Amino acid sequence: MKILHHLLKQSSVSGNESQIAQFLLDTIEQRKNDWKVCPQIYSGEDFHDCILLKFGNPRTALFAHMDTIGFMTRYENQLIPVGGPETEDGMLLIGEDELGPIECRLKVEDDSLFHDFQRPIQPGTYLSFAQNIRVDGEYIQAAYLDNRLGLYTALQVCENLEHGWVIFSTYEEHGGGSMPFLLKFIQENHPIRQALIADITWVTEGVVPHEGVAISIRDRYIPRRKFIDRVIALATESKIPFQLEVEASGGSDGREIQFSPYPIDWCFVGAAEDNVHSPDEKVSLADLDSMIDIHQYLMKHL
């Protein structure tokens, strides 16, 4: 869990993923020689902070987005949401501009957002929720479990993966944008026909804590049922706890796979959280274990 704590302390509001990308690259460099297969690494300016790891001869790709929701400063103490953060008066926000570190409170006035910092903040500065990590015997609670748990899962998968792509993407929380060029690169270098999305969903009346990872049959978008049935069959065979999710809203990097010109099947597989997009996101540790285990199993057997 130590690496997860480090991941949770990195800032990466959508569009500003350079810090978390460098942290991941450093972590990969430190660990890759201890993995079962040492991957080829694709990163840098040609990939806009995204990272692609190629293990062996891939059949399947696992995607995990690096960015988070947050805020950006405008003028006269105004804030604009990045993605869809929860907004409650008094939330503690942090960031940094050219004049130094920032710690302030969110102010909600007539559906408009402001900060209370004692000086003007440079327009275009990113602010994120102050981090407060809490772990007990059953849950982890913190800001940005979405999608730090996906990144953590992907790194765990890397340890024993023999064949597959593992991709760390950007922009997901604010409409996407990196997936088209990532898919093009994959399909031009070592094409695949199937993909898994390691991301976080929400607790509902049908997906509850401690009952296993959620396998999404649909959200706003509907993946091909033939592939979903294959994933469910393998999950059943694995005996790893899982739940089936059916929703009419929400989305992920899977949307951009479905809208791409490539015939790639996809499935969202992730733990469910309470207090979505808030400083107090809460996920069952048992469900996180299931998320890691099932991604490892699926990447081996698909």
Task: Annotate each predicted stretch with a short phrase.
Residues 1-302:
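N-terminal hydrophobic/helix-forming segments and targeting peptides
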